[in-house]
Regions:
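Electropositive polyanion-binding surfaces
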Residues: 153, 158, 163-166, 181, ...
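S1/OB-fold single-stranded RNA-binding interface
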Residues: 2-235, 239-247, 253, 257-261, ...
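Short intrinsically disordered, low-complexity coil segments enriched in acidic
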Residues: 2, 485-486
Length: 486
């Protein structure tokens, strides 16, 4: 074990490089500038300091000049050399010059809060976490007296760095989670989550706060909401979906048009600003989907119950409601808080069967003729919207999507290609319609003619960045060859 630790401790200069101050040995080095950034480390101990907002302007640091900085740390770095190298030809036929900067770390501003995952090794009363990570070249020394209960030799664990003393070959740390035996499904899944600092459980106080939220809808809750509880409403989701995020409502109007509602759960009604649940959601940022499980942003009572649009349950929602002609033209639109009660829960296969049979299949008396006709009509409208969208210059980014089927223990048993059909497009088109309607409403200050308003309110739009010039350049020869062949 000692041999391994010394080997990873690095070269002689490595000890000096961990001094906190910029040492006198560097007086001959000219410092071009100082930058602050995040460490991105390789398995060999090399470091790239990534500067926020400047991903293509990183600084290379040799293993001997890292001063004990590790992957994910925030550091100050002195840039000591810079040169320009010819880059790839850009889309305008010129070659962009690439900056190649080198430097050394002069201060560790903040240690990373992300744990490192490895295997616990114990010899006598000494303990280490042996690293298996591609961005952590050093094992972590653990104080034997701090080992958590249940931690045994050979187990996978997650550890945080406490510090790296001058002259020591490895950093010191402590174990924050015992993940289990390597190779077991739960262990490996938890290891993935731990490596990316994704919590797979909620603290008891967060769970308790969510459990205190009432699931009863009162007249007070309905005040100011448009009532869709008696309007035909349904959801279409994957077969294995546990929460139902959005729903569609459908109603024929006397003038021959259709009233179509796109509804999502009104999470803001339940998760109030500044509450412990709100703060936890901000920390998590999003739900994370693994092959065999979901790591939710909100506790189960919220994501799978209160905010899941389950059939035959009254729900508080936020909605985009449009009046649409049979030709797919939008006549009116409305946005606001609503209340719904979903009548049906379909999976994509079930909805597809109705579409392909023109509403005649499946022969299930529990599925009313009204919802069959609604799905068939909505599909025709969705195809019209889709055709119009592509005619206006939309690009399809559809690629084959692979799905992994697992058994009850989480073991993969089958990999298959997910086939996208009309039922998927139906949901996709109406979700896009809702998003686009909101963006147009803000940009035009509510005008129906689609013309922009200079006095429009400030809004956050999703705008794709400019294509990478090097990638465009590399596409040119391929496109030319393809066109010549045809």
């Amino acid at each position: 074990m000692q041999k391994r630790r010394n080997r990873q401790g690095g070269e002689k200069g490595g000890r000096k490089s961990r001094d906190k101050k910029f040492g006198s040995r560097q007086k001959s080095k000219r410092v071009l500038e100082e930058v602050t950034g995040k460490v991105q480390m390789t398995r060999d101990g090399y470091v790239f300091v990534i500067i926020e907002g400047e991903p293509d302007n990183d600084v290379f640091v040799k293993a001997s000049k890292t001063r004990g900085a590790l992957n994910g740390d925030i550091v100050r770095c002195a840039v000591t050399s810079e040169r320009k190298e010819a880059g790839e030809a850009n889309g305008r036929g010129r070659k962009d010059a690439a900056r190649r900067r080198e430097g050394e770390i002069i201060e560790i501003v903040e240690r990373s809060h992300k744990p490192f995952v490895g295997v616990l090794h114990i010899v006598g009363r000494q303990a280490w976490v042996l690293m298996q990570s591609r961005n952590m070249p050093y094992d972590i020394s653990i104080d034997f007296n701090t080992l958590p209960e249940g931690a045994k030799r050979g187990m996978k664990v997650a550890a945080l760095i406490d510090g790296w003393d001058k002259g020591e070959p490895t950093p010191k740390g402590h174990i924050v989670d015992v993940l289990g035996m390597p190779g077991e499904n739960d262990t490996e899944m938890h290891a993935i989550l731990a490596e990316y600092a994704l919590p797979y459980r909620f603290e008891p106080e967060v769970e308790n706060a969510a459990d205190q939220i009432s699931d009863q809808i009162t007249e007070k809750d309905l005040k100011g909401r448009r009532d869709f509880r008696n309007t035909l409403t349904f959801t279409i989701d994957p077969t294995d979906a546990k929460d139902f995020d959005d729903a569609l409502s459908f109603k024929k109007l006397d003038n021959g048009n259709y009233e179509i509602g796109v509804h999502i759960a009104d999470v803001s009604y339940y998760v109030l600003p500044g509450t412990i649940v709100d703060k936890e959601a901000q920390e998590r940022g999003t739900s994370v989907y693994l092959v065999d499980r979901t790591v939710p942003m909100l506790p189960e009572k919220l994501c799978n119950k209160l905010c899941s649009l389950r059939p035959h349950e009254e729900k508080l929602t936020f909605s985009v409601v449009v009046e649409m002609t049979p030709r797919g033209k939008i006549e009116n639109r409305w946005f606001g808080r609503t209340a719904i009660c979903s009548d049906y829960r379909f999976d994509y296969d079930g909805a597809q069967q109705i579409i392909e049979s023109d509403g005649k299949e499946p022969a299930d008396p529990a599925i009313g003729q009204d919802v069959r006709e609604a799905i068939v009509t909505l599909n025709k409208l969705a195809l019209t919207l889709r055709k119009r969208r592509f005619a206006s210059g939309a690009i399809s980014f559809e690629r084959p999507e692979m799905k992994v089927e697992v058994d009850a223990t989480g073991k993969p048993i089958r990999v298959y290609e997910k086939i996208t059909k009309e039922a998927n497009w139906l949901i996709e088109e109406f979700m896009l319609l809702a998003n686009r309607s909101v963006a147009e409403f803000i940009a035009t200050s509510g005008r129906m003619d689609g013309k922009a308003d200079k006095k429009a309110k400030t809004f956050v739009y999703r705008v794709h960045g400019e294509p990478n010039t090097e990638k465009i350049a590399s596409l040119g020869p391929v496109s030319y060859t393809h066109l010549r062949a045809h």
